[in-house]
C-alpha cells in the first residue's frame, strides 16, 4: 500500500483510509445499520492486513462504540506506532449532552474520552 505524508505533519498515512462510521453497537446511537463487533473486527483486521493504516472515526459514531471496537481490535493486532487514528470531537454524545460543541472544556473532555475508548494516549 502506498503511503503519503499527511499535510505538513510528517505523519505517513496509507493511500486509503478506512472510514469507521459503520462500525459499532447497532443498539447505541442513531444508526441501527452499523456492523456489530465481530463483523467490524473482521473488516478492520482485513484492512490492516491489506496495508490500510489510516482509520477515521468520531466520538458520536454509535455513541462511542465505534472507537471502542477500533481500540480493542488494534490493541490485539497492530502496534500503535503503525496506525494513524483520526477522530472528531464536536458531536453530541447521548449520555453527555452538555459536552458538545467546540468550547475548550468540551474539546479537552472529548479528546480524553476518545483516547480512553481508543485505548491509546495519542
Show where each model-derived region lies.
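N-terminal binding-site loop/beta-alpha segment at the start of enzyme catalytic domains
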Residues: 1-84
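Residue-identity detector for glutamine
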Residues: 12, 46, 90, 98-100
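Glycine/proline-rich, positively charged
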Residues: 27, 94-122
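Generic beta-strand or strand-like secondary-structure segments
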Residues: 69-73, 88, 106-113
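Conserved catalytic core of Hanks-type protein kinase domains
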Residues: 47, 88, 117
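Active-site-proximal loop/turn and secondary-structure-junction residues that shape catalytic pockets
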Residues: 22, 89-91
